[in-house]
Amino acid sequence: MIKYTDFFELIDNGGNLPIAALFMTYGFDAELFEHHILPSFIGILDDPRENELRFRNQIALKLKEIPIGVISDSKQFNGGRTFLYDHITVQNETFHPKCYMLLFKEYLRVIISSGNITKSGLCYNAELVWYEDIYLDKSNSISNELQFILSFIEERYSLDNMPALKMIRKYLNKCEFNEAYPKIISTCSNKNVFNKVISELKNCRGNCKTITIISPFFENDREKEIESTLLMSFLNEVKNIYPKAKINICFPANKQGDKYIVNAPFGIFNEVTKKYKDISLFVVPREWEREDDDPISRTLHAKLIYAQFDNGYNLYLSGSINFTNNAMTSSISNLRNIEIGVLNYTKQKLILPNFIKVSLSNLEFVEKEETIKQLTCFINKAEYNGKDLKILFNSNKMVVPCKIYYNENLLLSIDNQIEEKIIKNFILKKPQDLKVECNDFIFYVPILIPNKEDIITDDLKLNFELDMKDIIDYLSGKYKSISELERMKRIVSNEKQDRNNEMLIFFRQNLQRFYKALLAL
């Protein structure tokens, strides 16, 4: 079984001074990020449900000091951003890593996971999480590859104006690198993950007894350059190195009657079990255990290749990499997915989930129906300079007619293909994204703000200094909560009402509230 780990404990600054953070994720839930991850990292203790205005004011002030960057896949973004932090969405390839880098004053925390920044990834799925803290006065084995990945991403996606990325790269430049395990591997290199894993298996000491492959997704597409499925190709390589190694293939399933319903392609398993008799199939049910041993239903989303050797060592690969062609065979020359994983060779054993051994006759393959049409994100950039909003379109991909909304209001209605549109005197409100509606699909585009330090949002205009009148009003029951009081103060401030005139107008009412408040004390 995989023990339950609270991801949010790794994000919490624990009293350490936060400097910058970069979050690279496939799916991105802005509400989850802004209400839980962001405040945990920058050190905001207020609950937005109890005091939303103060919560937003504190985060807005912190973001003036601490640069935050998010990179996610464009097709998986559903809008919802409300704070000034950098967010870039990737369109050219599938951006699939789950790598989170948190820079504190004393160290850099690197988290490599199978879980996205979504409610499913951080709260409900069964995921694997690996992390390491890098200190400047200690050598490490991962800083060089991380530096290479960030350099590649910065150049490929033109991230020259992302301060969080630059600050983390600057820190990595100071680190002392040592060639050892664990190693970071990615698809941002000339050698793909498939070949890297095979090379590592060849170079390990001892004989491999067992290899366990856990993946929520498998592919059975036969590409022209591959004579068999990816899984068969991998097993052929493994058996060539370690002929006696046993292979365990594990995948999620739901039990219905005497059958296990799976979405892993049936043909793959039929092919490999016919050729190799020492291959075992296992299903991972949706029943997991937490540390308190209370059963909890979780969907398997972890990815793992786990090789056990007769010398007591174990080689494992975890991270974002599914056992699919797009993930395992991508490289710079054939880049379909951006993936990041960690490869470790250690005597430490992993605690695996409860497996149920099955035969092919126990399985029933159900292919998921694609009900949603493929998105085409045709806006390259939406950039706000403090006065105007410039929208750049990819005319080759553009779908018309389309409508662009901001803050639930129609901003543009476009009937013909264009390359650029400038919205003069654009007023930035609370939402930080554009919503694009076409006939068949909807997508969201984050608004980029290069000069964030010059932008004063409503969250920064709030003043929470309460005077005697405010206290009297609150105690007398004029306001249901402190949040309502602060909201009214903001309205008064925005309307620039004169304080002296206001006190004259409401003198009698305030006097009545004063006596009422005395009775309440």
Per-range role (PLM):
Residues 1-317, 324-521:
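Terminal interaction modules at protein C-ends
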